[in-house]
Curated annotation (Swiss-Prot):
Pathway: Pigment biosynthesis. Transmembrane segments: none annotated. Pfam families: Scytalone_dh (PF02982). Scytalone dehydratase-like protein; part of the gene cluster that mediates the biosynthesis of the bianthraquinone cladofulvin, a conidial pigment not required for virulence but that plays a role in fitness and resistance to environmental stresses including UV light and low-temperature stress. The pathway begins with the synthesis of atrochrysone thioester by the polyketide synthase (PKS) claG. The atrochrysone carboxyl ACP thioesterase claF then breaks the thioester bond and releases the atrochrysone carboxylic acid from claG. InterPro entries: NTF2-like_dom_sf, Scytalone_dehydratase, Scytalone_dh. Induction: Expression is positively regulated by the transcriptional regulator wor1. Expression is down-regulated during biotrophic growth within tomato leaves. Belongs to the scytalone dehydratase family. It is an enzyme of class 4 (lyase). This is Scytalone dehydratase-like protein claB. It comes from the Eukaryota. Signal peptide: none annotated.
Amino acid sequence: MTRQAVPKPAYEDLVDCQSAMFEWAESFDSKDWDRLSACLAPTLFLDYSDIMGKKWDALPVEEFIGMASSPHFLGNARIKTQHFIGASKWTQPDEGQIVGFHQMRVAHQKYGDDELKQVLYHGHAHGKATTYYRNVGGQWKFAGLVPDVRWTEFDCDKIFEH
C-alpha cells in the first residue's frame, strides 16, 4: 500500500504557527483579549457544531473576540480554563494556509463567588482540534478552529449555563 505524499510546512512556518496556537490558547485561558487579537487573522473559519451548534465561514475577528469575551462564555470571571495541546501533525494545502491537527484536553472550572473559592462545577473535554493558519502580510495568524469533542468528564455541560 502506498501513501500519497501530504505537503508539509517548512520548519520556520511550523514554528510560527505553533507560536500563534500558543498565543490563542494562553489568551483564552488568561482572558487577555488584546493578546488574542494580535494572533488572529482578520476573519476566522469556526465550526463549533460540537460545542455550540454553530458554524462560521468567515467570522470577523472583532465578532469572534466579542463572542469569546462575552460574560456568557470565556469572559465570565468565574470561569477558568486550560486549553492543553498534545501531539500534533501539520499539513500545508497551499502556500498561504497551514492546517494543524492536535490532541486536546480542555479543563474547565466554574466558581460560585468572585473570590474563586467555591467551586460550583468542573468539567473536562477530551478530543482533537483541527486548526487553520493563514499567512497575513508575511506573518502566520490563527485563522480557524474545528473542535471534535470525543468525550467529557464531570459537569462540562453546566460550565457555560447562566
